[in-house]
Amino acid sequence: MSNEKTNYGALFTLITVFFFWGFIAAGNSVFIPFCKHYFELDQFQSQLIDFAFYFAYYVGALVLFIIGTGKGSDPVAKWGYKNSIVYGLLFSAIGAGAMIISVYNNVFTGMLFGLFIVALGFSLQQTAANPFMISLGDESTGSNRISLGGGINSLGTTIGPLVVALALFGSASVSEEDIQSLGLDKVILLYICVGLLFVGIAALFGFSKKLPSGKNEEKIEGASKALRSLLIITGLLIVCFAPVFSSYKSEKAIQILNKEEQIKKLESLVSNSNTIAILENDIIKLREPLEQERMVWLSLGLAVVVIGLLVSLSRSKKNPTGWGAMQYPQLILGMLAIFIYVGVEVAVGSNLGEYLKHQMNLNASQIAPYAALYWGSLMIGRWASAIHAFELKEKTKHILTIVVPLVAFGIVLGLTSLAGHDVSNLYAYIVCVVIQIVGFYLGKNKPARTLMIFSLLGLIATVIGFTTVGIVSVYALLSVGLFCSIMWPCIFSLSLGGLGKYQAQGSAFLIMMILGGAIIPPLQGKLSDIIGIQPSFIIGSICFIYLTVFAFIVKRMLNKQGLNFE
């Protein structure tokens, strides 16, 4: 492995887009809840908003691959990483414009389409940005540079909501009711600013002299077998998802909604308590088979991805011709790892609120600081991992590995307090941060070793989370954010190791697997309806078992190929 010097000028320019990804997400955190209220969306339509965003990543990366297969060259590599990011930003700006027009004209389908276009742009940006990060220095330290980008992204995600809240409400503390009562003119102005940010960053990148083009016009062999495999997986996923979405408009679902409306009308009268109890019992009888049916289809969707990728792995090993980037086993296993990692990270974050509500009897305002700490934990870990992206003395790195996570923890608590939340119950979480610091020392800045250690810690955390009670279980589940924080860069760099001219194509395949965020979280949600919210976190444990195995296997695979990531 070469010891190529890091191009810091290009690196610092590139991380600006990571910051604005996080900052723009803050705009969405206001815009999307407003749209849900403004359009008076039912449960089905609300699910469509979340699904459209994740599915766009899958579709965008698949379209890039189809174009590349048809032309015999990877479009991102041909355009260059720099131009691809610019095109992605402009594409997202068009989507932002479509969302603004749709909201102004009260057209929900148009807003949904606009959000889909925004996410398609993100798909192109991330397909280019991650291998771009790796290419700016030694391939073996690429995970550190991706961690730096992730840390800056988390910073944007953390401070963005405060800036948006101050700009719109004049206060850092914002409730869901505040968002719902926003004037249409303010919301449209907010997203106009988001659209202008897309254009502004595109201009920054387009005219930057520090960023190399990142072009690679080398021809790549056709990947017809990989395309056929992915199209089959896509078709089967549509078959699995269609019944889930149609179930929200089924006769049983409509009956449930009608009975819930009846309960709302009767709740004000004490004399109607018996009638309400009967209606609630009817809802349970209607909902149970409906939820079980949805869980079956979501489970089949998960099986389609897992089995489809494993079958592709088996066939590409027998004859690598026609598989493109998927001829490399580390990539296919990495695709499954990204799918599972994104799924478990989003699943724990999405279901944490429900756990705190039912097991700890907390209300929405009391849950908010815990949710902020979970997502803030991602920033804590990424900041610590990013230390190794800089050429510092070993002693300095050792000191910063201790200091940086503690400072980041203090910043997360400070910003959460600034938003008007009580953080006194979160001080003891510093113990979890210290455990993460120990994990970094044991990992020795080696991606496979670090991934294995943090996957094991994630496994332990989820097991403690669903087997204990009280604040111990809460801290354990919160710490999943700490242990997930380094997984994206580690999986990315290990999966793309040794791919050469197929690196951009491999990156697109990995981005496709963000789809895990659309399958695993609702699967846990449906499981919780059947066995309870706390036991449902066993799904996280299963995910971390695979990630541990992946870290062990991929290290051996790369060594056999003469690649040393240690």
Task: Locate each region found by the language model.
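Extracytoplasmic
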Residues: 9-41, 61-64, 160, 348-356
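Extracytoplasmic gate region of multi-pass secondary transporters
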Residues: 28-32, 236-285, 324-381, 414-416
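Central cavity-lining transmembrane alpha-helices of secondary-active solute carriers
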Residues: 47-74, 372-385, 516-519
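Conserved MFS/SLC helix-loop-helix module at the cytosolic interface between two early adjacent transmembrane helices
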Residues: 61-109
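C-terminal ends and interior cores of transmembrane alpha-helices
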Residues: 90-105, 409-423, 440-444, 457-469
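Intracellular juxtamembrane helix-capping segments at the cytosolic ends
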Residues: 124-138, 349-352, 485-500
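Glycine-rich segments within core transmembrane alpha-helices of 12-TM secondary carriers
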Residues: 141-172, 198, 506-521
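C-terminal membrane-cytosol helix-exit motif in multi-pass small-molecule transporters
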Residues: 164-173, 192-219, 226-252, 296-316, ...
